[in-house]
């Protein structure tokens, strides 16, 4: 029995070492095939690109609160967020994702939507590379300009015009929260296609902003009372 146990331990150690070596080889191979970040630089010079300084803080605050509340402290992959999302999705709470804003930038610029281990590996490696090359505000800026938000709108400036007929600097807190709820499911959650779900998402985001100290109780109450006025 003792010999069998010893043999099992040896096989287990060999399996772990072998798995680690295979993982290292896969990572090295994937690293060599990663694209350059030139596409990000080029996109920042497109005519309709909106710099972060011209995006309302209420809007960036709402987006970070719902999409990636640890955005400014993680290195592209939020391991705490992965665990929290798993717990939330097993409970009765609104479902949460584990993709960070950086991972979404990597996916939106470079990758397909295929749910494969290879694509996920590229997404993780690209996220680390993006984090090393750009500041957090630059990454958030790219996200705010690129993300699809339903009704043919790409980026929050386009979405503000599409849904409310406004410029970004004209948005109210309630409208910012409404738009921030779109990235998760832009076709299903937008106020044109499904006002009830859009409202539910808006309220949840305002609650998160209040809990995180991004807005005051008065701002929260005022935003809840504001009627929805689409263009």
UniProtKB/Swiss-Prot annotation:
Cellular component GO terms held in the UniProt record: extracellular region; membrane; outer membrane-bounded periplasmic space
Main location: secreted
Alphabetized InterPro entries for the sequence: Glyco_trans_51 (IPR001264), Glycosyltr_51/Transpeptidase (IPR050396), Lysozyme-like_dom_sf (IPR023346), PBP_transglycosylase (IPR036950)
UniProt entry keywords in alphabetical sequence: Cell shape, Cell wall biogenesis/degradation, Membrane, Peptidoglycan synthesis, Secreted, Transferase, Transmembrane, Transmembrane helix
Top-level lineage group: Bacteria
Membrane-spanning ranges: 8-28
Subcellular location(s) of the protein: Secreted; Membrane
GO biological process per UniProt: cell wall organization; peptidoglycan biosynthetic process; regulation of cell shape
Biological role stated in the UniProt entry: Cell wall formation.
Name of protein: Putative transglycosylase H16_A0665
């Amino acid at each position: 029995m003792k010999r069998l146990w010893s043999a099992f331990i040896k096989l287990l150690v060999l399996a772990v070492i072998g798995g680690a070596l295979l993982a290292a080889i896969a990572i090295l191979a994937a690293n060599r095939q990663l694209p350059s970040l030139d596409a990000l630089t080029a996109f920042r010079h497109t005519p309709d690109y909106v710099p972060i300084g011209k995006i309302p803080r209420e809007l960036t605050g709402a987006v970070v609160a719902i999409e990636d509340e640890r955005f400014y402290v993680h290195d592209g992959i939020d391991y705490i967020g992965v665990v929290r999302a798993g717990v939330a999705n097993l409970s009765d709470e609104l479902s949460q994702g584990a993709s960070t804003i950086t991972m979404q930038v990597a996916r939106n610029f470079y990758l397909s939507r295929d749910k494969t281990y290879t694509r996920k590996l590229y997404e993780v490696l690209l996220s680390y590379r993006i984090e090393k090359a750009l500041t957090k505000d630059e990454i958030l800026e790219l996200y705010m300009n690129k993300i699809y938000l339903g009704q043919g709108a790409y980026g929050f400036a386009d979405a503000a015009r599409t849904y409310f007929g406004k410029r970004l600097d004209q948005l109210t807190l309630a409208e910012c929260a409404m738009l921030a709820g779109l990235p998760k499911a832009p076709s299903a959650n937008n106020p044109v296609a499904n006002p009830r779900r859009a409202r539910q998402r808006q309220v949840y985001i305002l609650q998160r902003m209040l809990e995180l100290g991004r807005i005051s109780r008065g701002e929260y109450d005022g935003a809840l009372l504001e009627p929805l006025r689409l263009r």
